C-alpha cells in the first residue's frame, strides 16, 4: 500500500516510516524540515500536496508544531504557534476535501483541555476530521529518540540527557502522572489502521500504555538504568495538564495492545542516545 505520512521527520513520523517500509508499504513523507516546499502551513504548497495525495492510498496526518511540556509552557500562548498550526490544518484538510483520501488524524489526549491552545487546536483538528469522515487517534505521551532542538524535547529524553551529566534537575515536584508509550508500540498501533483493521470510524482510538506513572518514578527508572544519578526536585506543579486525568478508551485493544514496559522503552532510548 502507498502511504503519505505528513510530519514524516518527527519523533513519531520517522520511526513510523521506517516501520511501515519494513512491512512492505511504499511511503511518501512530507515534512517542513525536508524543504520549504513541504511546509503545510504555506498555502503555496497546497497544489503540490494535492498532487501527492492523489498518488497514494492513505494519509497519516501527524504534522503539528509541538514539543514537550517546557516548550508548551513557553509557546502555547504565542500568536506564531497558534497561527502556524491553524494554517497547516486548514491547508491539509482543504487538500483532503478535494482528494477524499482515507486519512488518520493524530490528535492528543489533551484535546479536551481547552485551558491550553494545544488542546484546543487538537480539538479543532478532530472537528475538521469528523466533518470529512476521517479517523481519529489520540496519542498519550509517546516517547522515543528525538532529533530536535533541546527546547522541544519531551520529559524522558530530557531526563536521559541530564542523567548523562549525572544530575536530573526536574521542573516540577514530580507528583504529576502521565501514561507513556514507546514509539515501537505506537508504530504497531498505527500499522493496524494502515492495514484497515479498525472497524468503527466513530471511535476515538487511544494509543497509550494504559498505565499511569508519576514523573518522579520516571526519573527513578532512568536512574536505575543509568547508574548513580542525583535527582533534584523542582517546585512547579502540573502547569500543562493541571492534574487532569482523562480515562482512555480501550476500544483499540481489539486490534492492538502495547507490549513494552516503561523500563524497556526507556532502555531502548538510553541505548540510542548513548
Label each PLM-derived region with a short phrase:
Residues 61, 87-120, 135:
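Conserved Rossmann-fold NAD(P)-dependent oxidoreductase catalytic core, especially the SDR/UDP-sugar
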Residues 44-84:
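NAD(P)H-binding glycine-rich loop region in Rossmannoid oxidoreductase-like domains
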Residues 42, 84-91, 102, 124-125, ...:
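Conserved cofactor-binding/catalytic machinery of classical short-chain dehydrogenase/reductase
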Residues 115-119, 123, 127-178, 183-192, ...:
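NAD(P)-dependent short-chain dehydrogenase/reductase
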Residues 6, 57-63, 105, 206:
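Rossmann-fold scaffold of SDR-type NAD(P)-dependent oxidoreductases
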Residues 3-23:
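N-terminal Rossmann NAD(P)H-binding glycine-rich loop of SDR-like oxidoreductase domains
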Residues 28-48:
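Adenosine-cofactor binding site in Rossmann-like domains, unifying the SAM/SAH pocket
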Residues 165-274:
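C-terminal substrate-binding subdomain of Rossmann-fold SDR/epimerase-dehydratase oxidoreductases
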